[in-house]
Amino acid sequence: MGFTRNELLEVLNSQELSKEEQEKIIPIMKENYDGYKFNINATNHIYNSNMSLYFLAEYVWSRKIPSKLVDVNIASDYNKIGNMLNLCKGEKKLEILRKTVEGEPIIADIVAKFNPAIEFNENDMISMLYYLGYLTISGENLGMPELTIPNKVMKEIYADFFMQIINKEASFQLDNTISQEILREIAIEGKLDKMVETLKIYLNNLSNRDMIKFDEKYIKLIFYCLAMNMKIYWVKSEMEVNRNYTDILLVPRDRSKGYKAIMVEFKYLKKGDTSKLEDKQKEAREQIIRYSEFDEIKDIEELNKYTIVVAGNEIFVEKIV
């Protein structure tokens, strides 16, 4: 089913990897392949064995971190998540995706048997995602398991599918040219102009889609999902670390290339409530200043700080200098 940490270390030692090499690759493997727990009473997580072995095979052959952290053959199996989620309709599907991508636990009574041909309800779908390793046990609530995404690789898969649904509902497809323009502007100039233009398209196209109960707070999630596809960045968020933290932080993986870092704090107002805009911007500025003093943030070079206030169909951006 998977490797414990000790079993993984045995595999690493069998490949005659030095202590220095192990210290380099274990944190990457932990972030991307660890996190699985299939018993509410279990005390330790396990690593995905298939993905771990793929990573090690690539590393042992090249002595470099693989550029792709998921084998294409394994990734094709993960595309099945879309087919499963499509069995659940409308807002329920989007809400499950929102919770999972944001890191919010899903409390569910895992069923032992289900028959999609007869009936396939929300709890059945959550149970199936659990059995197939798309969700895992992260805690307990009143005797029932709390389920979350186990690791970064799985989060990227969910984020991709979330954007597929959003693109379909918005009748808008972000092409590769626009994606590259957004990335180039962020990385080279530290600006968000093209990203915000794209967010406005989603906001305007989705605001009238009552069938999915679109909320302006989805804009932050769309920003996060788009950022997850920027492979030159580490993406951290309040959703991810589950504590008092900036909403979204983009830090270049390779700081020697001079790419800009980005820090964003989001706030929201009801449509027509722009009289409170300055108050919301001030609140966001104060949070940005406070978070900037965190040890892991204050030493980040080339950090560009922004507040974004979403009010109805409008987006107000302020750069903090």
Q: Where do the PLM segments sit?
A:
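Noncatalytic linker/hinge segments flanking ATPase motor cores
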Residues: 8-20, 178, 189, 304-310
